[in-house]
Amino acid sequence: VPMGQVKNVYKALYPSNRWRDFHDFNAVSVYVPEMCFLAPDGKTIIPHYFDLSRSSSLLEAYPGKPFYTSDEYDRRMVKMDVANDGTLSNLSYFVEQGEFGSAVDKEGNLYVADGEIYVFDKDGKKKGMIRVPERPSTLQFGGKDGNTLFVTGRSKFFGVRIK
């Protein structure tokens, strides 16, 4: 469906990471495509990007909240604003670390998969590192209380209790 046709966007799903050989990561990340996939709920969109299938996962972007994604080529995380229509803008460099997936906890801390799992507060200050048995690629919070960080690696899937 056309991007502008969807009203009252609840969330958008964007690539968790991008590899851009042409060093056009910033422009591609805030580009607004003409079309999007619309979920059955009628308010969740997936903007149609030519490199959508290249990403290791999709991350949820909620209007009014910051969205983080990884620039694989330059190995850094960027932060963007999410508008009411689900589009991204105001890209800024957040931390000089990042390879694949990331996840944000209830307090706004950012967990970044980059060989290990690095933890940053909402201002970009490094809070720590979580060693894992295998190079992480995708991160997602879940569990009964939302305090388990689920991690995928090349051959393993495991959970790390955060609190």
How would you name each of these model-derived features?
Residues 33-36, 76-78, 116-118, 156:
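A short loop-to-beta-strand structural motif that recurs across blades of beta-propeller domains
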